[in-house]
Amino acid sequence: MSTVVAEGVIPVAAPARDTGAFDPLVELRGVWTPDLADRYLPIPGMPPVKYECQDGHLIVSPYEGSANTYAAYRMLTLMEPPARELGCRVYPTLNVQLGINRWIQPDFAVLNEPARGRIWIPGTRALLVGECVSPSSRVADRIDKPAMCAEAGIEYFMRVEVSYTKNHAEITLLRLGDHGDYEVHAKALAGDTLETREPFPLRFDPAELLED
């Protein structure tokens, strides 16, 4: 059978009521926490996936394709030097906890201080989180995750969109405003220049996120 999660369909094992076995995807629906995630994730037999949680509901999604993986890698290399100058650290996917029953695994993140081996990163330690948008994550990356990150008080949210068929690359850097919502701080398309002094100096053409 299949369980519908977020905007995709991920094959999972039959429910516990059919087999008599404990199935965390069924039994823990709506009550997931980091403690339960530490105990039951990853799900045995599942393909490699990202596990995120919104208000106790587990969201399972496949890992990114090569276009987004490369874009995230390039963002890491571009941000690492200026972020380190401020004492910050840049990371690929982390478990960023946004509440007692909320967490995300952003494609990249900048923390105010080194993680030093931590598995769960409090949202208060994140200066910036970034997502590379894919067709299956468009709603989550544009609406759901920014709303949760804003509520958690993360000052910056970066959205990256790349397409090789359209030769398109776009970066939108959002900053938390006075009313608790994100506002556009900087934005650029391939062929233009993204330039910002905050949260640290960046100046580059988004086309650099596309492999040549």
Task: List the predicted regions and their residue ranges.
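Gly/Pro/Ser/Thr-rich low-complexity, intrinsically disordered segments predominantly at protein N-termini
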Residues: M1-D212
